[in-house]
């Protein structure tokens, strides 16, 4: 099978979401198992929520304790199933990921997106760092062999800023209301549980 023959899945992604992190971690094996390709669409989760009139689960479910607690159970179940032993909740959550997401667009343009996401994902959801702090973010990128200063310098470029806005608006226009969202054959799938459902539609 050539690359052009592969089924491609658009992945609406922001590292702000722990479920986005969990999906990112299992995607490499998923791609090998099903011979599919995920294309990351870098968006801003806060913007998606605002444009779709949605709220983060921790706010939307704050007055529904059973539902709020279920999300914790369901994450633990996914973590155990996929042996994602490094995952941990970040005590600084919620974290402003605007700079990181702009950096992801820079990395995507320059050809090292997955390496970049691996790096910021570890900082956010394994090392418990306050990745919204510019100095911490730069140091973390540098320690991973990426040029934090150069990446962040480009995040102020108007084209990068506008690209993130457009990606976010386009995602909501297509039907997205949160992360992780997937688009397969023009059908929308939401949540990490969609990874089990999508093979029926390949």
Question: What are the language-model segments listed below?
Answer:
Residues 1-3:
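Eukaryotic N-terminal low-complexity, Ser/Thr- and Lys/Arg-rich leader segments
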Residues 5-10, 14-37, 119-202:
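C-terminal cap of thioredoxin/glutaredoxin-like
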Residues 22-124:
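Structural alpha/beta surface segment adjacent to cysteine/selenocysteine redox centers
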């Amino acid at each position: 099978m050539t690359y052009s023959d592969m089924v491609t899945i658009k992945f609406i992604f922001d590292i702000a979401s722990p479920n986005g992190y969990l999906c990112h971690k299992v995607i490499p094996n998923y791609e090998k198992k099903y011979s599919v390709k995920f294309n990351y669409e870098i968006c801003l989760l806060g913007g998606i929520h605002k444009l779709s009139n949605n709220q983060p689960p921790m706010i939307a479910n704050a007055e529904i304790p059973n539902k709020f607690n279920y999300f914790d159970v369901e994450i633990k179940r996914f973590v155990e199933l996929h042996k994602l032993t490094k995952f941990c909740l970040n005590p600084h959550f919620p974290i402003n990921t605007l700079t990181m997401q702009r950096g992801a667009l820079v990395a995507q343009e320059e050809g090292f997106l997955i390496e970049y996401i691996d790096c910021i994902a570890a900082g956010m959801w394994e090392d418990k760092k306050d990745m919204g702090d510019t100095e911490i973010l730069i140091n973390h990128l540098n320690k991973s062999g990426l040029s934090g200063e150069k990446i962040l310098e480009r995040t102020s470029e108007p084209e990068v800023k506008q690209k993130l806005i457009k990606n976010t608006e386009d995602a909501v226009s297509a039907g997205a209301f949160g992360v992780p969202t997937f688009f397969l054959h023009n059908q929308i799938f939401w949540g990490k549980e969609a990874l089990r459902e999508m093979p029926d539609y390949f």
